[in-house]
């Protein structure tokens, strides 16, 4: 049964990727109203006879959401049936299920009643946390037989706090990026890294969309520098742990690609493939940070038990 759970968790994690990218695609292509204000039906029909491009994108996103939802429900059921004694696994499974339901309801509410750009930006953030929960559940299932060799990693208190802080800050950066999409501020600034490279900052002349765009760039730049500094420190301090060592190097690579593809969005005038890769890299990056948070929680718990004994 453990093997079945592992396979199902891998499939669920992989399927979360097109779910997240599908949501970004809906926004990028302006397909949010592809089915009108009808949900779960499309234009009041199960399968409309005339399907436009926008309708196809929206229907595909709903279909993927439904499939992933069924996978997570089944995975949660099996976890409860077979591993209810493992509190970490049960918590992650029910967290993933709850977040999946929440993000689906927010998506449905956006279709039926409409939502502000700020509320819609939250939709992607919740989906990202849901992905992190499924990803961690998969890792936890593989850790049952100690194949990842993470049980002996001790993360000191200072580094744990830094991991929590950068993870929380990443969510803020993700929210600002989602706000860029939902307010159509992607090309509010035609240059990079400044809004207009051949002039002074001129921030007093920025309109709302330029403030949103440049605010996101500033936040992303800080995140990149922070990740570089933290990676150097973690690699030096935990070089004896191969999993931790390589995980941080992968994380640094992901944030580097994230910044690169963010710039390419401007240079290619919002090329769709580039924009989707931009969403993919931040998803994987946050997944890695979630892994570090998981290890930090575990290290704190071991430290607490050690002090008590």
Swiss-Prot record:
Disulfide bonds join 35-42, 189-195. Keywords: Cell membrane, Disulfide bond, Heme biosynthesis, Iron, Membrane, Metal-binding, Oxidoreductase, Transmembrane, Transmembrane helix. One of its GO terms (cellular component) is plasma membrane. It catalyses: Fe(II)-heme o + 2 A + H2O = Fe(II)-heme a + 2 AH2. Pathway: Porphyrin-containing compound metabolism; heme A biosynthesis; heme A from heme O: step 1/1. Signal peptide: none annotated. Heme o binds at residues 61, 123. GO terms for biological process: heme A biosynthetic process. It is a multi-pass membrane protein. Heme b binds at residues 216, 278. Its main location: membrane. GO terms for molecular function: metal ion binding; oxidoreductase activity, acting on NAD(P)H, heme protein as acceptor. Its EC number is 1.17.99.9. Belongs to the COX15/CtaA family. Type 1 subfamily. The N-half (TM1-TM4) and C-half (TM5-TM8) domains are connected by an intracellular loop. Each domain is formed from four-helix bundles and they align in a pseudo twofold symmetry manner. The N-half domain is the substrate-heme O binding domain and the C-half domain is the cofactor heme B binding domain. The cysteines of disulfide bond Cys-35 and Cys-42 may be involved in transfer of reducing equivalents from quinol in the membrane to the active site of the enzyme. Interacts with CtaB. This is Heme A synthase. It comes from Oceanobacillus iheyensis (strain DSM 14371 / CIP 107618 / JCM 11309 / KCTC 3954 / HTE831).
